C-alpha cells in the first residue's frame, strides 16, 4: 500500500458540487471557485475560443 493513512480520507467527500452561476457540477468546495465558469474567482464568465468548434469543423486563428 502506498501513501499515508490520510490519503484514504480523500475520496469520502465530493470535490465538486453544482455551481450557483452556471449550474454545472464544477464548483470546487475546498478552493471556492467553479472550474467551468470561474465563479468565485472572477466576475467575468470564463470563456475561451477553443471551447467551441466552428460549423465547418475548422478553427480560424
From Swiss-Prot:
Gene Ontology BP, a term: translation
Key word Transcription present: no
UniProt zinc finger (C4-type) residues: 19-37
UniProt: Zn(2+) binding residues: 19, 22, 34, 37
Entry GO terms, CC: ribonucleoprotein complex; ribosome
Cofactor field: Zn(2+)
Signal peptide, first to last residue: none
Transmembrane intervals: none
Keyword Manganese: no
Protein name listed in UniProt: Large ribosomal subunit protein eL37
